Amino acid sequence: MNLTDWLGYIESTHPSTIDLTLERIRIVLERLNLNVSFPIISVGGTNGKGSTCSILESIYKEAGYKVACYTSPHFLHFNERIKIQGVAVSDGLICEAFSKIESAREEVTLTYFEYGTIAAMIIFSEADVDVAVLEVGLGGRLDAVNVFDADCAVVTTVDLDHMDYLGHTREAIGFEKAGIIKPSSAILGIVCKMPAIPKTEPDNFLFRAIKIPKGTPIMIARNKDKPTATKY
């Protein structure tokens, strides 16, 4: 099948377009025995995820690293979602990755986004990249991207979005988005821009409901203010 055929096929394999869970993707990844040895930066938040990914991609590229970037949605071509060194990967590489996923998944159905996420990581692993920047699709805690532990987690903004899936308060939505932060993360980078949150609200309101080790480094940036480094 060509890429157009594959995309039509993967749209039909799962009954729901959005079905937040990590169970299915974990099963398929275990069967693929995918080895992810490069550092991962996961970028979540309500707005600004795509631009943040682009900035990080450019920084790493200019610094001489072989950088991979996975974003969504695409504008014209699916390939735009999966880039290495700022260049969209070929149809052939994506089709090869889809074929491997199809052979491994057996009875497990995957969403369109789950297929794309696994395909991206297969391609990045085989390309031996130095670092990968991954944009969260929806929320964070149960998003397919979050099956890969982030070495650095970036949360851009927290606002009321996708409330049917994430909750009806900023605290509930913040909990879901902050789910990309792992206790094992070597570096934690947080960019907070929450003008609707009262000024008396502590910067760490996102982290109240999740277990972050004391002493974890956090970078706080409020609007255009100079970022400040602190520890949780």
Where in this protein do the model-derived segments appear?
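Hydrophobic/aromatic beta-strand patches that form the interior of the parallel beta-sheet core
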Residues: 41, 68-70, 152-154
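ATP-dependent carboxylate-amine ligase catalytic core
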Residues: 16-18, 22, 26-36, 62-148, ...
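N-terminal-biased segments
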Residues: 1-20, 78, 134-136, 152-161
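Acidic, Mg2+-coordinating active-site environments of NTP-dependent enzymes
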Residues: 128-135, 150-189, 196
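Short functional linear segments
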Residues: 1-45, 52-54, 58, 62-63
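Short, strongly patterned local motifs
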Residues: 188-232
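Short active-site-proximal "capping" loops at secondary-structure junctions
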Residues: 47-49, 74-75
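Conserved phosphate-binding and hydrolysis motifs of nucleotide-dependent enzymes
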Residues: 45-48, 135-137
